[in-house]
């Protein structure tokens, strides 16, 4: 995969290699309900998020599932996914990148700016090898 972003120690002092950063979350009460329903427009936003996050898109696919949409972007550094439920004004987002040159937090922000949630639950996980 891409370069290893950093090296850290765990709680017992052992060295860990951090291979990737996974930024994920739930978007509640999204104001942009039309975007929640449009595979084509949501793909554009995911491509912009990848660009803003310094990621290289290899492929992107979307599916209309009921009223909602699922978008999966395979990036050179890993992936970005968005799943929507317009009837609940809700979306889930995952941005996972193994590239130290990327900014998954920025990609996540771009998605939030577009969907306009009233509330965001955000999590971050370092993927590492001890």
Swiss-Prot record:
One of its GO terms (cellular component) is cytosol. Binds 1 pyruvoyl group covalently per subunit. The record marks 77-78 as: Cleavage (non-hydrolytic). Its cofactor is pyruvate. Its EC number is 4.1.1.50. The keyword S-adenosyl-L-methionine applies. Is synthesized initially as an inactive proenzyme. Formation of the active enzyme involves a self-maturation process in which the active site pyruvoyl group is generated from an internal serine residue via an autocatalytic post-translational modification. Two non-identical subunits are generated from the proenzyme in this reaction, and the pyruvate is formed at the N-terminus of the alpha chain, which is derived from the carboxyl end of the proenzyme. Pathway: Amine and polyamine biosynthesis; S-adenosylmethioninamine biosynthesis; S-adenosylmethioninamine from S-adenosyl-L-methionine: step 1/1. It catalyses: S-adenosyl-L-methionine + H(+) = S-adenosyl 3-(methylsulfanyl)propylamine + CO2. GO terms for molecular function: adenosylmethionine decarboxylase activity. Gene3D superfamilies: S-adenosylmethionine decarboxylase. Keywords: Autocatalytic cleavage, Decarboxylase, Lyase, Polyamine biosynthesis, Pyruvate, S-adenosyl-L-methionine, Schiff base, Spermidine biosynthesis, Zymogen. It comes from the Archaea. Belongs to the prokaryotic AdoMetDC family. Type 1 subfamily. NCBIfam families: SAM_DCase_Bsu. Catalyzes the decarboxylation of S-adenosylmethionine to S-adenosylmethioninamine (dcAdoMet), the propylamine donor required for the synthesis of the polyamines spermine and spermidine from the diamine putrescine. This is S-adenosylmethionine decarboxylase proenzyme. It comes from Aeropyrum pernix (strain ATCC 700893 / DSM 11879 / JCM 9820 / NBRC 100138 / K1).
């Amino acid at each position: 995969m891409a370069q290893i972003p950093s090296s850290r120690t765990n709680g017992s002092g052992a060295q860990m290699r951090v291979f990737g950063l996974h930024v994920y979350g739930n978007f509640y009460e999204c104001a942009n309900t039309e975007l929640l329903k449009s595979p084509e427009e949501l793909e554009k936003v995911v491509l912009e998020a990848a660009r803003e996050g310094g990621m290289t898109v290899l492929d992107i696919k979307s599916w209309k599932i009921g009223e909602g949409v699922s978008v999966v972007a395979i990036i050179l550094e890993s992936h970005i996914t968005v799943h929507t439920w317009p009837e609940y004004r809700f979306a889930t987002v995952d941005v996972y990148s193994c590239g130290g040159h990327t900014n998954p937090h920025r990609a996540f922000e771009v998605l939030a700016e577009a969907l306009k949630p009233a509330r965001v639950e955000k999590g971050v996980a370092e993927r590492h090898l001890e």
